[in-house]
């Protein structure tokens, strides 16, 4: 029996009344853009796309050539379809409505065009993360303020990981599903329906070089992980860290674990490293739809009411029981 394609999957979701035609079209166009990005990434040095672009983004980060190219691909692909009202990107200062010459739709698209791009030059897996919201009714030209909706309002979220194979991992609010790009056919085929994150784990993903900057609750939590079976947790833990959120979260969706990017004192003015709207929210939706959990260490990420388009948050996501344990350390410390 042949595997269902992404196109068939989306049509069946529409027939079941779970999505409408506009959302189906939007996801289809995003997936096509991801194929183009996958081709560009796979060419590497041969495509002349590696290295710095010589520009910076609103985050103050140096842009890679592939950051800029991936952003342009997503903007161009989604401009003319009539399904989108506006889009926002990690690489742009402000949101961008669809051009006046094209029809406007009902949805808002947010994306990190190439997460983990600092790893591009060393051939580590990178990816595209995206989130879909509904545009508020009666809005002719959506601006930044119309994107400021809590993650619970997402109607779809996903990422495309460019690794040994290219995979699109998607949720429409009814489970998390993985599709693998069949390059000869040019189609994404369903390879894992209803992914499930194990409730318990013995793996954690964190950048330990920042340990000296963590708050006491975080120090205590990781200290107990490092103590292993001789410590309070009573079992040994392994650490995994790729420094590409898409790659680390993909591993967790596949076999469990907890991904952690906590607040630290390196820049106390920033509440976290990762961006809420186009990193934390879509990844949290994917993980929760797979039976996992996602918090800031103190509150559920999807419940946060955003106040800024490029807002940052601490992130703890993955296996439900381990996320609850990490959160408990922080909440207990707050009560002390």
Curated annotation (Swiss-Prot):
Its main location: cytoplasm. Keywords: Carbohydrate metabolism, Cytoplasm, Hydrolase, Magnesium, Metal-binding. GO terms for biological process: fructose 1,6-bisphosphate metabolic process; fructose 6-phosphate metabolic process; fructose metabolic process; gluconeogenesis; sucrose biosynthetic process. It is found in: Cytoplasm. Substrate binds at residues 115-118, 207, 273. This is Fructose-1,6-bisphosphatase class 1. Pathway: Carbohydrate biosynthesis; gluconeogenesis.
